[in-house]
């Protein structure tokens, strides 16, 4: 299995979620299952079945996070020595050549991506178009809404 790139912040968020699942959510669901069992017949006990389903989801998510963390390549963007080239972890300011609108994105791992926070996945069309480019270059992005051209205004690692 190949390594999954994660920023330090992304790995920490996964660790926090894992801790919450193991130490808060899992015990709560186990208690709910025990209480539902006390209500008698399990075949028609909706509370029991709902709690078991939630337990299954929690256990699956725990395994998923543990797998991601064990296969993670944790990268500190501030320590990346790739400048001026754009690589994973870069924060990039772009200007749309049509609208002259400027937007800034950080290229992060798949699990960290959040467009509202300007965090884009390393596998996104924008990131794929940017990787390997430098300040002053133009990047053509094949987006679902059509082709967009951006000028790379600034590249930084923080």
From Swiss-Prot:
Q: List the disulfide bonds in this chain.
A: none
What keywords would UniProt list here?
Coiled coil, DNA-binding, Transcription, Transcription regulation
- Give an example GO biological process: regulation of DNA-templated transcription elongation
Which molecular function GO terms apply here? DNA binding; RNA polymerase binding
Ranges in a coiled coil: 53-73
Question: Which Pfam families does this entry report, sorted A to Z?
Answer: GreA_GreB, GreA_GreB_N
Q: Which family does it belong to?
A: Belongs to the GreA/GreB family.
Question: Which NCBIfam families does the record associate with it?
Answer: greA, PRK00226.1-2, PRK00226.1-4, PRK00226.1-5
| Role description | Necessary for efficient RNA polymerase transcription elongation past template-encoded arresting sites. The arresting sites in DNA have the property of trapping a certain fraction of elongating RNA polymerases that pass through, resulting in locked ternary complexes. Cleavage of the nascent transcript by cleavage factors such as GreA or GreB allows the resumption of elongation from the new 3'terminus. GreA releases sequences of 2 to 3 nucleotides.
Q: What is this protein called?
A: Transcription elongation factor GreA
Protein's organism:
Halorhodospira halophila (strain DSM 244 / SL1) (Ectothiorhodospira halophila (strain DSM 244 / SL1))
């Amino acid at each position: 299995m190949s390594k999954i790139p994660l920023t330090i912040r992304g790995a920490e968020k996964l660790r926090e979620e894992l801790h919450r699942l193991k130490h808060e959510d899992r015990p709560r669901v186990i208690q709910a299952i025990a209480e539902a069992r006390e209500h008698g017949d399990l075949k028609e006990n909706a509370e029991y079945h709902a709690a078991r389903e939630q337990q299954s989801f929690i256990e699956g998510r725990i395994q998923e996070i543990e797998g991601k963390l064990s296969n993670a390549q944790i990268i500190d963007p501030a320590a990346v020595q790739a400048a001026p080239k754009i690589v994973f972890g870069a924060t990039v300011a772009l200007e749309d050549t049509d609208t002259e609108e400027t937007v800034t994105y950080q290229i992060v791992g798949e699990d960290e991506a959040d467009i509202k926070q300007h965090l884009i996945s390393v596998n996104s069309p924008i990131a794929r178009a940017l990787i390997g480019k430098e300040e002053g270059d133009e990047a053509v992005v094949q987006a679902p809404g059509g082709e967009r051209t951006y000028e790379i205004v600034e590249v930084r690692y923080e």
